[in-house]
């Protein structure tokens, strides 16, 4: 029998033990939180993407460099030293990159290719401040130098998990080369900083197959656009542009245009039959081969089990069930809000059904933005009015809503549709209202103006750039006004409604989309004695600091768009931890009371 004088000692020891356990759990929780915060703010966030203009100096053997350029279509790496923002990295792999943009430049007098830099290609384990590879894109198709930049800044503003991106001034062997866009690739580094680990799966969705040797962004070999002549340039005349399905007809069968193999569609992408290759996210059956647009472009290696999880989610989507189980609905609604505003039709929103990433973990999917150089009406658009008034509630072109289940199923849900409208309103308020869009464009222009003026290999003249910036200012302002009008009900928010009430649409006036640059809008090239190579570049997305001058001190809040969502998950973990601690304390007290009572 325990002597009564020992009971108090036992009680004290029990309580002390519970406190020790509690303190231990709290300390471990804080350590885990610190580790997570470290993962979400890698060194390359500040060292690489934390400056106004990223400086990239390439030092390569002249003979090897020229040989690489002359054989760019082979996409073969050469070894070079690279100085990034003053830090030298030796034996870095570099090669041309792109798809149709690569062939377009190769067929011109220009050598202004987009490039991929692979820091561990020749030196195992080497990184650029923790990043194994990134790309620099060459501004093809964008006289403004900032359409994609702004598109992804909008994504970041509304909380989408976009990659880091920033303007980059390139030099080669001491000579100025040009102003590019540096882009973080979707890979393990991205997963680690955004999701806390690299255990998920990434798929680069591309719906057309095109010849080539290497995949950009660690994905399958797919084009960012199509060769010259395969698709029409955006006209500046009248017409209903994207909103009349009868102007776009499906052609069954297969044919090719300059090496591109089309399945069930005419050039211009007017096909996309139900579940033809998975890019539409329509469920066909459980056969992996029927989703080639997704699984042919896996980042890294995938297994049959990985693919089956995606197909299971697509089946649920098409059946309209368990959406929040299989999809990160809130993140996708944010993505759709920004995506709709910028009118990118070389995407899921059109018959192309491509140019986005799928991230899958534990059976749940989300969509990540990619390849917005042809946004703001640079692809398949009618006239400027079509872009300005692009309908927010039927944001598709050349296809029916029913063939884009990710949009249709979410918009069928009144709660989800209301959230989508709230995100649109938030973007209008923060990004467009009261001259905010014009202010941001002017700040970015002030940052890059001298670089553009002195861009030795530019695809447009400095005067054309200035005209493009002015036109972009107007386009953005009018687009913001139209979205606000659609949210208020003053302008119809569906394609059919706009057709019936055409008089309520906002007029574009004399605005010409071609002034901004488009896929086929050849503008000449300063370094090529008037050659007119013009196309789209692949895989470009940059980061800019929301609400401030572009690129300045991005490290302080560059992750603001996604950290809040991730911290919510962390808060739930701490609630569980608090509950566990409470259980330990209660158990200890009850045990002590029982001992006191018994003895």
Where are these regions (language model features)?
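Phosphate/dinucleotide-binding and metal-coordinating scaffold of catalytic cores
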Residues: 1-599
